[in-house]
Protein backbone atom coordinates (compact mmCIF):
# COMPACT_ATOMS: atom_id res chain seq x y z
CA UNK A 1 0.00 0.00 0.00
CA UNK A 2 2.85 2.35 0.82
CA UNK A 3 4.59 1.60 -2.46
CA UNK A 4 1.48 2.51 -4.46
CA UNK A 5 1.11 5.74 -2.53
CA UNK A 6 4.72 6.76 -2.92
CA UNK A 7 4.79 6.04 -6.64
CA UNK A 8 2.81 9.21 -7.27
CA UNK A 9 5.55 11.36 -5.86
CA UNK A 10 8.67 9.28 -6.47
CA UNK A 11 11.53 11.00 -4.74
CA UNK A 12 14.50 11.86 -6.90
CA UNK A 13 17.73 13.10 -5.39
CA UNK A 14 19.43 15.78 -7.44
CA UNK A 15 22.65 17.21 -6.08
CA UNK A 16 23.65 20.59 -7.41
CA UNK A 17 27.03 22.20 -6.87
CA UNK A 18 26.46 25.91 -6.31
CA UNK A 19 28.89 28.79 -6.04
CA UNK A 20 28.39 31.31 -3.25
CA UNK A 21 28.40 34.95 -4.21
CA UNK A 22 30.01 37.79 -2.35
CA UNK A 23 27.94 40.57 -0.89
CA UNK A 24 28.71 44.04 0.40
CA UNK A 25 29.40 42.62 3.84
CA UNK A 26 32.07 40.22 2.57
CA UNK A 27 32.31 36.63 1.35
CA UNK A 28 29.96 34.04 2.81
CA UNK A 29 31.31 31.16 4.89
CA UNK A 30 31.90 27.89 2.99
CA UNK A 31 28.72 25.83 2.67
CA UNK A 32 27.61 22.56 1.09
CA UNK A 33 24.41 22.93 -0.94
CA UNK A 34 22.27 20.19 -2.51
CA UNK A 35 18.71 19.95 -3.79
CA UNK A 36 16.12 17.23 -3.24
CA UNK A 37 13.25 16.98 -5.69
CA UNK A 38 10.13 15.49 -4.06
CA UNK A 39 7.39 15.15 -6.65
CA UNK A 40 6.91 18.74 -7.82
CA UNK A 41 8.64 20.23 -4.78
CA UNK A 42 12.24 21.33 -4.28
CA UNK A 43 14.13 21.16 -0.98
CA UNK A 44 17.36 23.16 -1.03
CA UNK A 45 19.65 21.72 1.63
CA UNK A 46 22.46 23.96 2.87
CA UNK A 47 25.01 22.72 5.39
CA UNK A 48 26.89 25.47 7.20
CA UNK A 49 30.63 25.11 7.52
CA UNK A 50 31.60 23.06 10.55
CA UNK A 51 32.78 19.65 11.70
CA UNK A 52 30.41 16.71 11.20
CA UNK A 53 31.22 13.02 11.51
CA UNK A 54 28.58 11.95 8.99
CA UNK A 55 29.17 12.33 5.23
CA UNK A 56 27.00 14.34 2.89
CA UNK A 57 25.24 11.16 1.76
CA UNK A 58 23.84 10.62 5.24
CA UNK A 59 22.65 14.23 5.52
CA UNK A 60 20.77 13.96 2.24
CA UNK A 61 19.30 10.59 3.28
CA UNK A 62 18.13 12.18 6.54
CA UNK A 63 16.36 14.98 4.69
CA UNK A 64 14.97 12.50 2.18
CA UNK A 65 13.56 10.23 4.89
CA UNK A 66 11.82 13.16 6.59
CA UNK A 67 10.38 14.45 3.31
CA UNK A 68 9.28 10.93 2.35
CA UNK A 69 7.47 10.56 5.68
CA UNK A 70 5.62 13.86 5.35
CA UNK A 71 4.66 13.17 1.73
CA UNK A 72 3.39 9.70 2.65
CA UNK A 73 0.97 11.22 5.17
CA UNK A 74 -0.22 14.23 3.19
CA UNK A 75 -0.14 12.64 -0.28
CA UNK A 76 2.44 15.17 -1.45
CA UNK A 77 5.07 17.45 -0.02
CA UNK A 78 3.29 20.49 1.50
CA UNK A 79 4.98 23.39 -0.32
CA UNK A 80 6.56 23.84 -3.78
CA UNK A 81 9.88 24.97 -2.35
CA UNK A 82 11.56 24.99 1.05
CA UNK A 83 15.07 25.90 2.16
CA UNK A 84 16.62 23.64 4.79
CA UNK A 85 19.64 24.99 6.67
CA UNK A 86 21.67 22.50 8.73
CA UNK A 87 23.85 24.18 11.36
CA UNK A 88 26.63 22.07 12.92
CA UNK A 89 27.38 22.47 16.62
CA UNK A 90 29.78 20.75 19.01
CA UNK A 91 28.07 17.77 20.57
CA UNK A 92 25.55 15.09 19.70
CA UNK A 93 22.01 14.99 18.40
CA UNK A 94 19.51 17.17 16.57
CA UNK A 95 18.39 20.38 18.27
CA UNK A 96 16.70 23.74 17.90
CA UNK A 97 14.56 23.04 14.84
CA UNK A 98 12.50 26.02 13.68
CA UNK A 99 10.19 26.45 10.68
CA UNK A 100 9.13 29.72 9.06
CA UNK A 101 6.75 30.73 6.27
CA UNK A 102 9.19 33.21 4.73
CA UNK A 103 10.47 32.71 1.18
CA UNK A 104 7.93 29.97 0.58
CA UNK A 105 9.19 27.94 3.55
CA UNK A 106 12.41 27.91 5.56
CA UNK A 107 13.66 25.38 8.14
CA UNK A 108 16.78 25.70 10.24
CA UNK A 109 18.00 22.89 12.45
CA UNK A 110 21.11 22.16 14.51
CA UNK A 111 23.14 18.97 14.10
CA UNK A 112 25.79 17.82 16.57
CA UNK A 113 29.28 17.13 15.30
CA UNK A 114 29.32 13.68 16.95
CA UNK A 115 25.94 12.55 15.60
CA UNK A 116 26.04 9.11 13.95
CA UNK A 117 24.25 7.78 10.88
CA UNK A 118 22.05 5.62 13.11
CA UNK A 119 21.03 8.62 15.21
CA UNK A 120 20.14 10.58 12.08
CA UNK A 121 17.86 7.87 10.77
CA UNK A 122 16.12 7.60 14.16
CA UNK A 123 15.61 11.36 14.39
CA UNK A 124 12.09 12.74 14.72
CA UNK A 125 12.76 16.48 14.78
CA UNK A 126 13.24 17.15 11.06
CA UNK A 127 10.00 15.32 10.24
CA UNK A 128 8.26 17.37 12.97
CA UNK A 129 9.53 20.60 11.41
CA UNK A 130 8.50 19.62 7.88
CA UNK A 131 4.97 18.85 9.09
CA UNK A 132 4.68 22.50 10.16
CA UNK A 133 4.79 23.37 6.45
CA UNK A 134 1.40 21.67 5.94
CA UNK A 135 -0.71 23.91 8.19
CA UNK A 136 -1.54 27.61 7.84
CA UNK A 137 -0.07 30.17 10.22
CA UNK A 138 -2.55 31.04 12.97
CA UNK A 139 -2.66 33.57 15.82
CA UNK A 140 -0.23 33.11 18.71
CA UNK A 141 -2.88 31.90 21.14
CA UNK A 142 -3.43 28.91 18.85
CA UNK A 143 0.22 27.86 18.71
CA UNK A 144 -0.82 24.64 20.46
CA UNK A 145 -2.56 23.40 17.29
CA UNK A 146 0.58 23.95 15.19
CA UNK A 147 2.80 22.09 17.65
CA UNK A 148 0.14 19.54 18.48
CA UNK A 149 -0.31 18.49 14.86
CA UNK A 150 3.44 18.12 14.33
CA UNK A 151 3.84 16.21 17.60
CA UNK A 152 1.00 13.78 16.86
CA UNK A 153 1.45 13.32 13.11
CA UNK A 154 5.25 12.93 13.15
CA UNK A 155 5.42 9.31 14.38
CA UNK A 156 2.43 8.30 12.24
CA UNK A 157 4.08 9.75 9.15
CA UNK A 158 7.33 7.94 9.94
CA UNK A 159 5.46 4.66 10.38
CA UNK A 160 3.65 5.18 7.06
CA UNK A 161 7.04 5.58 5.35
CA UNK A 162 8.50 2.56 7.21
CA UNK A 163 10.93 4.65 9.25
CA UNK A 164 9.46 3.74 12.65
CA UNK A 165 7.74 0.79 14.29
CA UNK A 166 4.10 1.01 15.36
CA UNK A 167 4.83 -0.40 18.81
CA UNK A 168 7.40 2.32 19.48
CA UNK A 169 4.89 5.05 18.67
CA UNK A 170 2.27 3.72 21.08
CA UNK A 171 4.87 3.21 23.82
CA UNK A 172 5.97 6.82 23.38
CA UNK A 173 2.38 8.10 23.46
CA UNK A 174 1.57 6.15 26.62
CA UNK A 175 4.61 7.79 28.23
CA UNK A 176 4.12 11.32 26.89
CA UNK A 177 0.39 11.98 26.33
CA UNK A 178 -0.28 12.56 30.06
CA UNK A 179 1.98 15.63 29.82
CA UNK A 180 -0.81 17.27 27.81
CA UNK A 181 -3.52 16.89 30.46
CA UNK A 182 -4.68 20.11 32.19
CA UNK A 183 -3.27 20.86 35.63
CA UNK A 184 -4.52 23.09 38.44
CA UNK A 185 -5.26 26.60 37.19
CA UNK A 186 -5.56 25.55 33.54
CA UNK A 187 -7.79 27.82 31.44
CA UNK A 188 -8.01 25.81 28.23
CA UNK A 189 -5.73 25.38 25.23
CA UNK A 190 -6.04 28.96 23.97
CA UNK A 191 -5.22 30.44 27.38
CA UNK A 192 -2.64 28.06 28.87
CA UNK A 193 0.71 28.32 27.15
CA UNK A 194 2.88 25.90 29.11
CA UNK A 195 5.22 23.55 27.27
CA UNK A 196 3.12 20.50 28.17
CA UNK A 197 -0.17 22.01 27.05
CA UNK A 198 1.31 23.53 23.89
CA UNK A 199 2.97 20.37 22.57
CA UNK A 200 1.22 17.47 24.27
CA UNK A 201 -2.07 19.23 24.93
CA UNK A 202 -2.20 19.93 21.21
CA UNK A 203 -1.25 16.32 20.45
CA UNK A 204 -3.95 15.11 22.84
CA UNK A 205 -6.50 17.23 20.96
CA UNK A 206 -5.39 15.67 17.66
CA UNK A 207 -5.43 12.12 19.04
CA UNK A 208 -8.89 12.54 20.55
CA UNK A 209 -10.15 14.05 17.29
CA UNK A 210 -8.62 11.28 15.17
CA UNK A 211 -10.32 8.52 17.15
CA UNK A 212 -13.66 10.36 17.23
CA UNK A 213 -13.65 11.13 13.49
CA UNK A 214 -12.98 7.47 12.78
CA UNK A 215 -15.70 6.38 15.22
CA UNK A 216 -18.30 8.69 13.67
CA UNK A 217 -17.43 7.73 10.07
CA UNK A 218 -17.15 3.97 10.71
CA UNK A 219 -13.40 4.29 10.17
CA UNK A 220 -13.80 5.69 6.65
CA UNK A 221 -12.21 9.06 7.54
CA UNK A 222 -9.64 10.27 10.05
CA UNK A 223 -7.52 13.24 11.04
CA UNK A 224 -5.34 12.57 8.00
CA UNK A 225 -8.30 13.36 5.72
CA UNK A 226 -9.02 16.52 7.70
CA UNK A 227 -5.45 17.78 7.44
CA UNK A 228 -5.22 16.89 3.75
CA UNK A 229 -8.41 18.89 3.27
CA UNK A 230 -6.74 21.97 4.76
CA UNK A 231 -3.63 21.54 2.63
CA UNK A 232 -5.64 20.93 -0.54
CA UNK A 233 -7.58 24.15 0.14
CA UNK A 234 -4.30 26.09 0.08
CA UNK A 235 -3.69 26.10 3.82
CA UNK A 236 0.07 25.81 4.22
CA UNK A 237 2.54 27.71 6.39
CA UNK A 238 2.82 30.61 3.93
CA UNK A 239 -0.86 31.48 4.46
CA UNK A 240 -2.42 33.27 7.45
CA UNK A 241 -5.74 31.74 8.45
CA UNK A 242 -8.17 32.02 11.33
CA UNK A 243 -8.16 28.76 13.26
CA UNK A 244 -11.93 28.53 13.00
CA UNK A 245 -11.60 28.60 9.20
CA UNK A 246 -9.01 25.81 9.23
CA UNK A 247 -11.16 23.63 11.47
CA UNK A 248 -14.25 24.24 9.32
CA UNK A 249 -12.36 23.23 6.16
CA UNK A 250 -11.02 20.17 7.97
CA UNK A 251 -14.47 19.15 9.16
CA UNK A 252 -15.86 19.50 5.65
CA UNK A 253 -13.23 17.03 4.45
CA UNK A 254 -14.48 14.40 6.91
CA UNK A 255 -18.19 15.19 6.79
CA UNK A 256 -18.25 15.74 10.56
CA UNK A 257 -18.01 18.62 13.03
CA UNK A 258 -15.56 16.83 15.33
CA UNK A 259 -12.72 19.35 15.21
CA UNK A 260 -14.93 22.41 15.67
CA UNK A 261 -16.86 20.75 18.49
CA UNK A 262 -13.71 19.61 20.27
CA UNK A 263 -12.15 23.06 19.93
CA UNK A 264 -15.24 24.68 21.44
CA UNK A 265 -14.96 22.30 24.39
CA UNK A 266 -11.22 22.71 24.99
CA UNK A 267 -10.35 26.26 23.94
CA UNK A 268 -11.16 28.13 27.15
CA UNK A 269 -11.64 25.52 29.87
CA UNK A 270 -9.71 22.47 31.08
CA UNK A 271 -10.88 19.16 29.62
CA UNK A 272 -9.16 15.93 30.59
CA UNK A 273 -9.09 12.86 28.35
CA UNK A 274 -9.49 9.39 29.87
CA UNK A 275 -6.34 7.96 28.35
CA UNK A 276 -6.54 4.63 30.18
CA UNK A 277 -9.94 3.99 28.62
CA UNK A 278 -8.63 5.11 25.21
CA UNK A 279 -5.74 2.64 25.37
CA UNK A 280 -8.11 -0.15 26.46
CA UNK A 281 -10.60 0.49 23.65
CA UNK A 282 -7.82 0.67 21.05
CA UNK A 283 -6.17 -2.50 22.32
CA UNK A 284 -2.91 -0.96 23.54
CA UNK A 285 -1.46 -2.62 26.64
CA UNK A 286 1.70 -1.61 28.49
CA UNK A 287 3.27 -4.25 30.75
CA UNK A 288 5.93 -1.97 32.21
CA UNK A 289 8.56 -2.74 29.61
CA UNK A 290 6.82 -3.22 26.26
CA UNK A 291 3.61 -2.50 24.37
CA UNK A 292 1.27 -5.28 23.30
CA UNK A 293 -1.35 -4.62 20.61
CA UNK A 294 -4.60 -6.57 20.93
CA UNK A 295 -6.60 -7.12 17.77
CA UNK A 296 -9.67 -8.26 19.72
CA UNK A 297 -10.17 -4.80 21.28
CA UNK A 298 -13.36 -2.86 20.37
CA UNK A 299 -11.46 -0.17 18.44
CA UNK A 300 -8.51 -2.22 17.20
CA UNK A 301 -9.49 -1.43 13.60
CA UNK A 302 -9.27 2.29 14.39
CA UNK A 303 -5.82 1.80 15.91
CA UNK A 304 -4.63 -0.02 12.81
CA UNK A 305 -6.12 2.62 10.51
CA UNK A 306 -4.37 5.46 12.36
CA UNK A 307 -0.91 4.06 11.70
CA UNK A 308 -1.68 2.37 8.39
CA UNK A 309 -0.01 -0.83 9.64
CA UNK A 310 3.24 -0.08 7.79
CA UNK A 311 6.05 -2.63 7.70
CA UNK A 312 8.76 -2.48 10.41
CA UNK A 313 11.46 0.16 10.09
CA UNK A 314 15.09 -0.67 9.47
CA UNK A 315 15.82 -1.91 5.99
CA UNK A 316 14.13 1.03 4.27
CA UNK A 317 16.12 3.53 6.30
CA UNK A 318 19.35 1.85 5.25
CA UNK A 319 18.12 1.80 1.65
CA UNK A 320 17.52 5.56 1.79
CA UNK A 321 21.13 6.13 2.81
CA UNK A 322 22.42 3.81 0.11
CA UNK A 323 20.24 5.48 -2.54
CA UNK A 324 21.50 8.92 -1.57
CA UNK A 325 25.08 7.68 -1.43
CA UNK A 326 24.83 6.33 -4.95
CA UNK A 327 23.44 9.63 -6.24
CA UNK A 328 26.20 11.57 -4.53
CA UNK A 329 28.81 9.32 -6.06
CA UNK A 330 27.49 10.26 -9.49
CA UNK A 331 26.75 13.95 -8.91
CA UNK A 332 28.90 15.06 -5.99
CA UNK A 333 28.17 18.43 -4.44
CA UNK A 334 31.07 20.57 -3.26
CA UNK A 335 31.69 23.43 -0.93
CA UNK A 336 31.11 26.91 -2.20
CA UNK A 337 33.88 29.36 -1.60
PLM ranges: what are they?
Residues 68-76, 132-135, 155-159, 210-218, ...:
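Sec-exported extracytoplasmic/periplasmic mature domains
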Residues 235-337:
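Beta/coil-rich, acidic/histidine-enriched accessory regions frequently appended to metallopeptidases
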Residues 53-65, 116-121, 125, 140, ...:
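Soluble non-cytosolic domains of exported or imported proteins
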Amino acid sequence: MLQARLSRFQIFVVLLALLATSCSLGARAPQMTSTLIVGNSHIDVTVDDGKLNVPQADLIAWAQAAAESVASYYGRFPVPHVSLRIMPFSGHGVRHGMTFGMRGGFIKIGLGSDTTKAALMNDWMLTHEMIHLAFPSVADEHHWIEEGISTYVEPIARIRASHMKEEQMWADLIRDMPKGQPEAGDQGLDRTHTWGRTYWGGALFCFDADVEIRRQTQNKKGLQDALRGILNAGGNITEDWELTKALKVADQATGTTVLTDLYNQMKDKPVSVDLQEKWKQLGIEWDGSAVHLRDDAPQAAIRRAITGAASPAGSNADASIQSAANAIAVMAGRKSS
